[in-house]
Structure formats: C-alpha cells, structure tokens
Amino acid sequence: MKNLIKALKTISMAMIAVLMSVSFVACNTDDDNIVNLNLKGRWYTKTESVNNLLIINDDNSIVSFKVSNYESWENVKGNLTVDGNEISIYFEDGNSLSGTCTMTDNILTINTTNGEYKYSRLADETNLVGDWNYSNITFSAKAIKDEIVIPGGTINGVEVPPTVMQTAQLSGEFIKFAAQRYFRNIKFNNDGTMAYNVLKDEGDLSLTKNYSIDGLNMTVSGETAGHKIASTFMVLQSYDNNTAYFIFNKENIAEMFIGYALMLFEGGIAPDVTDEALNAYKKAFTEAFDYYSVEFIINRAK
C-alpha cells in the first residue's frame, strides 16, 4: 500500500510538471491572430499544492522548477514543438502533452484536456533595490511530530539545556503574525545590505542584515540577538518589478527559524550558533514535518 501511494504521488507530481510546462509556445494573442511570440524567460504560477517556475530558453528547451507540499526543489527538463497555436511538450522523463494557449497582458492561459492554467511573466533578473512593504504570506504544512527538540550541550563553557518547541507554534497563524510584525517595511540597498522595522511593544526596532542574489537564489545573513544565521531560498520578481516572491521549503525555512529557536534559551545569551548546531536543528525540524512550504510576498512601496 505504501509503495502504491508513493507511486501515485510520483505520477501525480510528474503530471503537474508536464501540465504546467505548456506555456513555452506560439500562442493566440488577445486579438486572436496567431503569431510567433518570443516567450524566452521566466513564468510563474501557483496551485493549491505547487509553486511552479518555468524557464524557456532560446532553443525551445524547458526547465520546470517546483516547490510542492510533498517535495523539495525539483526540476524537469524538456523541449517543445509548435504548429500554429498547437503545441507539443516532451520531457526527458518520458512524459508528453499537447494543448493550446492564449496570451493577454503578459498572462499565459494554458488550455489542456485536464483544465486551464495561468502563468504570469516574470522579470528575467531580480533587482530588489528600494523600499518594500509586506503584502501577503501563504503557508502549507503537515506536522508528523508534536515537538521539535533542539539538542543542548556545553558550548564555550556554557551549559545549554535542550530546547523543546511545539510544532503547533509554527503554524500558519504564527508565520503570518511573525511576517506582519517583523517584516512590515523592508529597504534593500545597493551595497548588499537590507534594513527592516520590527514592531515591538515598546516601539519599532530597526535591524540590518546582508543579502545577495545569484540567479534564482537569495541569501540573507547576519546576526539575530548576537547569533550568526543565514538562509538561502528562491526569489522571483514580477515583470513590472513591483512584486517579489520569496519561496521556502522545509529545509531552508528551518534556517530562518534557527534565530527564533535560539531566543528560547534562558536569557537569550546562547553563544553563536555553530554549523553543527544548525545542522542538528535543521534535522530536528525537517524530521518533525511531512511537508512545510511558505510563499512570502512583498510589494514595492508607493
């Protein structure tokens, strides 16, 4: 039974990747004239269980990236052929699909026998320099343990007890609360630093961290209450450059939580986190959840 479920899950996720990859085609435009469009670049869509990024290259080769409830980062490669507005998609894993599409205002609508899918064109490169405001966050997770136990020990002569976190503490409501409280206003600078205001009972607190962007990956690093932390996740930007999407799976969201976890130590004075401690926490976190995915959205300030 377990093998059957696993097989069905694999097939379903593969089909999602195939269905979502038909956007690299020659499409009908909004005036119904069939034209060959240059669809090179990045396209993005989201369903109930999958955040999907599609990349089309000059040679009509395709790469489909996704973060789903059941998987970490995954990519599927393929190619397409076009005949008018009829397209055929072929993937290296043996899957294929045919369909048609239309495009209006940089929105691709994909019509297949299995339904309709809409993709938004993204910017080819991400540039976050400027002021941003929190917009929204979506969350999906399933805990398989009630607790996350962060190992203790003696670090730099300080006896640090194990820390126990309830997985219920890391629910969608907690994520939304934290995002609204800690990332209401964000400023990205040209020098690779970012500043944001934290809402505290006694007033706003301004914090500064470092950031870097390499293709689809963004890394944020710095110190939280004296603890060195870093997290790398996927970053995407809308075609008009006014919306940015930060996408986390359970491995890299664990890195973001390490600062919060360390604050639970008595007095908040635990020594700087080591690679060993970070790996122990990430292991405990990922083992506590079947899946955990977050999409954090910000809009450019007006």
Give the positions of each predicted feature.
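Lipid interaction determinants
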Residues: 30-77, 83-206, 214-302
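C-terminal motif of bacterial Sec signal peptides marking the signal peptidase cleavage site
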Residues: 22-26
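Bacterial N-terminal signal peptides that target proteins for export
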Residues: 2-14
